Amino acid sequence: MNKFEDIRGVAFDLDGTLVDSAPGLAAAVDMALYALELPIAGEERVITWIGNGADVLMERALTWARQERATQRKTMGKPPVDDDIPAEEQVRILRKLFDRYYGEVAEEGTFLFPHVADTLGALQAKGLPLGLVTNKPTPFVAPLLEALDIAKYFSVVIGGDDVQNKKPHPDPLLLVAERMGIAPQQMLFVGDSRNDIQAAKAAGCPSVGLTYGYNYGEAIDLSQPDVIYQSINDLLPALGLPHSENQESKND
């Protein structure tokens, strides 16, 4: 049974929705922290920082690393470190290092979630234009989509550097709807985090929240999307298509 009426396009978030990018992001964050002689965070912690773009990711990483370093030194009976470099400058340096390292590990550290390719293919075959809206820095987006063999499904791709205001601001979603030539209420937006759902609500788009993403450790139902699914292929019956049961490995 269709849950959505008059949907003429579908747009997706990337990290935590279509792809598990945490391994690559965490590796790059830790390499950048290590280069500045700061404690490394690990994937489990970095996952809670993903979703607001690279600059915010660096701010969260630096804040945690400075606090962690202070705690470690206090435990060892050592005096605190006086940072000669202001935090804002350290964030800028950390971001530069992160970009370099992430460029090296992004493809090998990013995997499609199950059923993503089948679902995108089924929606495209139905004739629905598909869009991508991500806060990820734009230079990383196209190469990653190509490496994962899903670039072919999207008619509109908006990266984090393509708009002045990133999600949760509605501008990226409004831009995608405009380029699709449809009204915002005719574009379904699918994401895994409160930023995604807030952006969809602000833009006037119906929303789907997926339970398996990152979302800062919060349950997606707290953001009150219109519908919550555990798997991305649950979209298909909601849009009048048969449910795909094809299995995909992370490396497909």
From Swiss-Prot:
GO terms for cellular component: cytosol. The keyword Zinc does not apply. It catalyses: 2-phosphoglycolate + H2O = glycolate + phosphate. Its EC number is 3.1.3.18. Mg(2+) binds at D13, D15, D192. Its cofactor is Mg(2+); chloride. GO terms for biological process: carbohydrate metabolic process; DNA repair; glycolate biosynthetic process. The active site is at D13 (nucleophile). Pathway: Organic acid metabolism; glycolate biosynthesis; glycolate from 2-phosphoglycolate: step 1/1. GO terms for molecular function: metal ion binding; phosphoglycolate phosphatase activity. NCBIfam families: HAD-SF-IA-v1, HAD-SF-IA-v3, PGP_bact, PRK13222.1-1, PRK13222.1-2, PRK13222.1-4. Specifically catalyzes the dephosphorylation of 2-phosphoglycolate. Is involved in the dissimilation of the intracellular 2-phosphoglycolate formed during the DNA repair of 3'-phosphoglycolate ends, a major class of DNA lesions induced by oxidative stress. Belongs to the HAD-like hydrolase superfamily. CbbY/CbbZ/Gph/YieH family. PANTHER family: PHOSPHOGLYCOLATE PHOSPHATASE. HAMAP family: GPH_hydrolase_bact (MF_00495). This is Phosphoglycolate phosphatase.
